[in-house]
Amino acid sequence: MGSNQVWKHSVMVCAAITTHQYVSAEQIVNGMHQAKAEGADIVELRLDCITNFHSHHDLKIILQNKPLPVLIVNRPKWEGGLYEGDENKRLEALQLAVELSADFIDVELKAASCLPTLVEHMRNHNSHGKIIVSCYVDGTTPPHEVLLQLVELMQATGADIIKLVTLAADITEIKRIFSLFLYCQVPLIAYSVGERGLISQLLSPKFGGFFVYGSLAGNPIPGLPSLDSIQEAYKLEHVNADTKVFGLISKPVSHSRGPILHNPSFKDVNYNGIYVPMFVDDLKKFFSTYPSPDFSGFSVGIPYKEEVLRFCDEVHPLAQSMVAMMVKHL
């Protein structure tokens, strides 16, 4: 466990399976097959969300019949999860997952004192699984310095991978998430939840993220792209550090069909760009946070079609009467 080498990889797509929609381990296995069919590389399973969870019975069925690598999470209530039982039993479920060849085990930073025992358990069972140390931050995204401190604390545990999740109250907070990838010495999963945090998933490959999370068809999750859109509209496997970012600035923005129209056009002309929806609350703050050259141009929707003129270097006379307009940073 642990490495000082920065991993180079193509981003992996992780299906977030909301396990409370399934009433049996067999149905969870079916959900994993659905995730694979929709393009997922890995599946995250929340044991704390499984109704009437029986660790030995359910984990055996799930892990012995998995069609994809599995990340096991057993999130306690004190970290935003649903588990309220005995802490030792919670950790025992993770140890059992190790014995049954889980590919990734998630351990909260606050519970990192259990890592030596878990690592020894992995060695005793010849496990090749990886340990993810995670931290979920309540409230708005903290300042950059606080986030860096959390990253350093998680790295110091010796984890193979670290994971940091915040709640985005404003899209400009996501820039702090993107900046963390420059400082991390192990693979990092970092994103913000909620509709304003969507770009933290879609642009993760550009900045060096290890996972991108997606939702299954028929089970949308706020702030997560669907697995289908990752494959068909955004084609995140082609996004890299040189990718130019375009997007729709609007509030709300989930209705936009722009990604379906523009991203295929980029690919048709072999242009390294991505078009994403951007839920923006404050135009001035947004433009000062995401300047050129990486953020190259924007379409503007309601309620900013008139206000955006104040931020343009030049305005073509025809733009005054257009229903929507393209803003280009010069």
List where the protein language model places each region:
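Structural motif
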Residues: 24-27, 143, 147, 173, ...
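Phosphate/diphosphate ligand-binding glycine-rich loop within oxidoreductases
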Residues: 243-330
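Short beta-strand elements of ligand-binding domains
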Residues: 71-74, 133-135, 190, 318-329
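Short beta->alpha junction loops
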Residues: 17-23, 136-138, 165-168, 276-283
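Active-site beta->alpha loop and helix N-cap motifs at the rims of alpha/beta catalytic domains
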Residues: 3-145, 159
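Catalytic alpha/beta core domains of metabolic enzymes, predominantly
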Residues: 104, 110-244
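Eukaryotic N-terminal low-complexity, Ser/Thr- and Lys/Arg-rich leader segments
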Residues: 1-13, 232-242
